[in-house]
A protein has these predicted regions:
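N-terminal localization/anchoring segments of enzymes in phospholipid and broader phosphate metabolism
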Residues: 1-538, 556-560, 572-691
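Active-site glycine- and acidic-residue-rich loops that bind
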Residues: 548
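Hydrophobic alpha/beta core scaffold segments
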Residues: 563-567
Length: 691
C-alpha cells in the first residue's frame, strides 16, 4: 500500500506520489470489466461478452500503449508523466498485472462459464473430448470447410520464417523426417474467416483444437514432435507529421506499415514446450519479458460468436428506447426544428432514442426544402448508418453539404477513408481533418431559411454519429438554435475547413486553444469563492482524468475545501483522499451493461450551477492534440437533468467502484438492508416513465 507524505500547498502538487501511472490505472479499469464476467447476476451470454471485451481491450492496449512505452524506453527519451515512474518499472508492472489478469480470466472460463454453458445446453469441448458421433460430424466439416484453406509453412533452406500477422491465432510445430532424422519448425495459421467454434449437434469445438488434431494430414510421412498455440500482437501506433501536405496519403501509408509493426507481445499456451517457445521468440525478436504464458483457449475475443447466439433466456432483456414526448405527436415524428425553436433539448442515449432524435435531425434537414446547408463531423460511424446516405442525398439535391471525416481515427482509418471517397464522389465537400490534430468534436449544423432570415440549428454531442454504438454507449447530445452557440460552432467549422487562426469563442470551450484554460478557470473560480465563504461543489463525469494541469487545479480546489465528486470510467491518474491535498475528492467508476461515454463538467458556487457537455476527456491528447468542443447547458430544466444523471450515478451501489488513496479500487456496496441501486437500470426506468 502506498502512503503519501503531506506536501506543502501548491509547491508540492506536482509530487509524483500524488499521481497514478496511466498504464497501470488502465489495467485496473480492464479488471473491472473482467469482474463483470464473474457477476452471477449478469446473464450468461453477457458474461461471455465481457470476457471478449476484456481481451479485445487488452489487445488494443498492447498495440498502442505498451508499444508506445517500449518505443520510448528504446529511444531513451526522459519520462514526462506526472507519476514519473521509470519506463522499465511500468513495463514490469504491466507484465505482472497482465499475467495475473489473464490467468484469472482462464479460471473464470474453466471453473464458471464453461460449466454454466454446458448446463444451459451449450457445451464447449476439445476434439479429444467428443463422442464418436460428434467426431464424425466434425471430421466431415474439417474435410469440407477447413482443410482446403490451411497452408502449412515450414522453415528451412530457402524457406524463411513466415510473416505472422498481428492478432492471428497460430499453431507452431516441430516436425521430424523419420528417414533423414531432420527436424524443422512449421506454422499453420488458424483461418480467421472461419467460425472460431465448429458445431456438432449441441457441442461447439474450438477451431484450433480441430486443426491441432489433424496436423498429421498436413505433413504426410512426417512425425509431429511438438505443437504450440501462439499469437502475436504488433505495434499499431503511428504518428503523422505536422508538415504532411497529403494527410490521406500519409494515413494510408501508415495503415500499410501497421501490418509489419514490431511484435510487442507473444502469447503461448501455458504448457508450451520451452524450446519451441524459445525458437518462436528468437525468430520474432521478442524479449522474454514480452512472452506471456496463458491458459487455453488463447484469444477470448472468439467468445463474440457465443455471445451472439440466439438465446434470449441467456441475454439481457432488450431495451427499446422510448421516444421522448417532444419527439412524437400522436405517434408520428414531430418537426424537430420547431421543437428546437421552443427551447434547447437534451438527449441521453441509449435511454433516449438515437434514431428519433439525432438521425431524425439529419434526415429532416435533407428532406426540408428550406434547408440551405448541412455541416457535420464524422469520427467513427457504422456500415449501416443512415447518416452517410442522408448526406449524399442532400448533396445530390443541391444543398451545400460539408462533412469532416477524421481519417486518423485509430483502427477506423480504412473505414473512414472509404466513407470519405463515397461522400466525395457524390458531391459532398469532404475535409480530412488537420495534420497533427485529430478532430474529435461531435458536431452537426443545419442552416435553414426561415422567412427573411437564416437560422442555424446545432447538435453537439459527446458520442459518435454511430447508431450501433448509440445502443450500447451512454452519451449526451444538446440541440440548440441559440445564435451565440451556433456562431461559435460555425466559426469552428470555418477554422477546420478554411485557412485561418482559431478564433475566440463566445460560449463554447474548444481545444487545443481554450478548453483546458476554461475548465481550470471554472475550478479556480469555485475554489476561490469557497475560500471566501461561498459554498461550492465540483462534479465531473468523463472517461479519463489524467491531465496534470487539470488535476493540480482540482487539488487546489480540494485544499480550499471544495467537495469534488468524479465519475471516471477508465483511467484515473490522481490519488483521492490524501490529507492536505485531495481529501475532499471522491472518485468513482461505473462499469456495466452500457459503456459510460458521456462527459459532464458541473461547477456550483453559491447555489448556482454552470455545466458543460462535450467530446473531451481530461487527457493531454484531448486538450493539446485534438479539436474538441464542450458546450454550456444553460436551460435550468436541462441542468436539472444533467445533475440528476450525476446524482443517480453517485448513488449507485451495483455497478460502482471507488478509488482509494493507495491506488486500489473497491466495490461500492449498499448499506445493510438496502437493495443495490443500478444506475443504468434506474435511468432506463425513468426514461420509460417519461414516455
Amino acid at each position: 500500500m502506498t502512503t503519501v507524505e503531506h506536501p506543502s500547498p501548491r509547491s508540492g502538487l506536482s509530487d509524483p506520489e500524488l499521481y497514478i501511472n496511466r498504464e497501470l490505472s488502465w489495467l485496473e479499469f480492464n479488471q473491472r470489466v473482467l469482474h463483470l464476467a464473474q457477476d452471477p447476476d449478469i446473464p450468461l451470454l453477457e458474461r461471455c461478452k465481457f470476457m471478449a471485451i476484456f481481451s479485445s481491450n487488452l489487445d488494443e492496449f498492447f498495440m498502442v500503449r505498451v508499444a508506445a512505452v517500449q518505443d520510448a524506453q528504446a529511444s531513451g527519451r526522459p519520462s514526462s508523466t506526472p507519476d514519473a515512474l521509470p519506463r522499465e518499472d511500468v513495463l514490469q508492472g504491466i507484465g505482472l498485472r497482465v499475467q495475473e489478469l489473464v490467468r484469472r480470466q482462464g479460471a473464470i472460463w474453466r471453473r464458471e462459464l464453461q460449466p454454466l454453458l454446458a448446463d444451459a445446453g451449450i457445451r464447449i469441448a476439445a476434439f479429444d473430448r467428443l463422442s464418436e458421433h460428434e467426431r464424425v460430424a466434425i471430421e466431415e466439416r474439417f474435410e469440407r470447410e477447413v482443410y482446403p484453406v490451411l497452408t502449412p509453412l515450414a522453415v528451412g533452406p530457402g524457406l524463411p520464417f513466415p510473416y505472422i500477422s498481428g492478432l492471428s491465432l497460430n499453431l507452431g510445430l516441430t516436425v521430424r523426417d523419420p528417414i533423414e532424422n531432420e527436424v524443422r519448425f512449421a506454422r499453420i495459421k488458424v483461418p480467421p474467416r472461419l467460425p472460431r467454434f465448429l458445431a456438432a449437434g449441441d457441442v461447439l469445438v474450438p477451431l484450433e483444437s480441430v486443426i491441432e488434431h489433424h496436423v498429421d494430414r498436413l505433413f504426410p510421412g512426417m512425425e509431429v514432435v511438438d505443437t504450440v498455440q501462439f499469437r502475436v500482437t504488433r505495434d499499431a501506433d503511428y504518428a503523422i507529421s505536422d508538415e504532411s501536405d497529403d494527410l490521406l496519403g500519409a494515413v494510408e501509408a501508415q495503415i500499410r506499415r501497421r501490418r509489419f509493426g514490431h511484435v510487442v507481445r507473444l502469447e503461448v499456451a501455458d504448457d508450451a514446450p520451452a524450446d519451441l517457445v524459445r525458437q518462436l521468440s528468437d525468430s520474432l525478436g521478442v524479449r522474454q519479458q514480452d512472452v506471456y504464458r496463458v491458459p487455453l483457449p488463447l484469444d477470448f475475443t472468439g467468445l463474440w460468436q457465443l455471445a451472439s447466439k440466439d438465446r434470449p433466456d441467456l441475454r439481457d432483456e432488450p431495451w427499446d428506447a422510448p421516444r421522448e414526448p417532444w419527439l412524437t405527436s400522436d405517434g408520428d415524428p414531430i418537426d424537430i426544428f420547431a421543437a428546437i425553436r421552443r427551447g434547447d433539448l437534451l438527449v441521453h442515449h441509449p435511454y433516449d432514442d438515437f434514431e428519433a432524435s439525432v438521425e431524425r435531425f439529419v434526415e429532416q434537414a435533407v428532406a426540408d426544402p428550406s434547408v440551405l446547408a448541412i455541416k457535420q463531423t464524422m469520427y467513427r460511424t457504422s456500415g449501416d448508418s443512415p447518416i452517410v446516405p442522408a448526406l449524399i442525398r442532400a448533396a445530390e439535391q443541391g444543398k451545400q453539404t460539408v462533412c469532416l471525416v477524421e481519417v486518423q481515427a485509430r483502427f477506423d482509418e480504412q473505414n473512414n477513408i472509404q466513407w470519405e471517397r463515397k461522400l466525395e464522389r457524390s458531391g459532398v465537400h469532404v475535409v480530412y481533418g488537420l495534420a497533427g490534430l485529430k478532430t474529435h468534436a461531435k458536431l452537426a449544423m443545419v442552416i435553414r431559411r426561415e422567412g427573411d432570415r437564416v437560422r442555424r440549428y446545432v447538435h453537439i454531442g459527446t458520442g459518435n454519429y454511430n447508431p450501433t454504438t448509440a445502443r450500447i454507449y451512454t452519451d449526451l447530445g444538446l440541440f440548440t438554435c441559440r445564435e451565440d452557440v451556433a456562431e461559435d460552432v460555425a466559426n469552428l467549422f470555418n477554422y477546420i475547413t478554411g485557412f485561418a487562426r482559431q478564433p475566440a469563442y463566445e460560449q463554447v470551450l474548444v481545444a487545443p486553444t481554450y478548453l483546458r484554460e476554461g475548465l481550470v478557470g471554472e475550478i479556480d473560480r469555485v475554489a476561490e469563492a469557497h475560500r471566501q465563504g461561498t459554498p461550492g461543489r465540483i462534479a465531473i463525469k468523463c472517461n479519463a482524468m489524467l491531465d496534470g494541469e487539470v488535476i493540480r487545479a482540482l487539488f487546489r480546489a480540494s485544499q480550499a475545501g471544495v467537495p469534488i465528486q468524479m465519475i471516471v470510467r477508465s483511467i484515473a491518474g490522481l490519488r483521492p483522499g490524501v490529507p492536505g491535498v485531495s481529501e475532499t475528492i471522491e472518485l468513482r467508476s461505473i462499469v456495466g451493461r452500457y459503456l459510460e461515454h458521456a462527459r459532464i463538467f458541473a461547477f456550483t458556487s453559491g447555489g448556482e450551477t454552470r455545466a458543460w457537455i462535450g467530446s473531451a476527456d481530461m487527457m493531454v491528447r484531448n486538450l493539446d492534440k485534438r479539436v474538441e468542443l464542450v458546450t454550456p447547458v444553460d436551460d435550468p430544466a436541462l441542468l436539472d437533468e444533467l445533475m440528476a444523471i450525476i446524482e443517480v450515478q453517485l448513488a449507485d451501489t451495483a455497478l460502482a467502484w471507488q478509488l482509494r488513496s493507495d491506488g486500489t479500487w473497491f466495490r461500492v456496496q449498499p448499506r445493510s438492508g438496502e437493495r443495490p441501486l443500478n444506475s443504468q437500470d434506474e435511468l432506463m426506468r425513468r426514461a420509460a416513465a417519461r414516455a
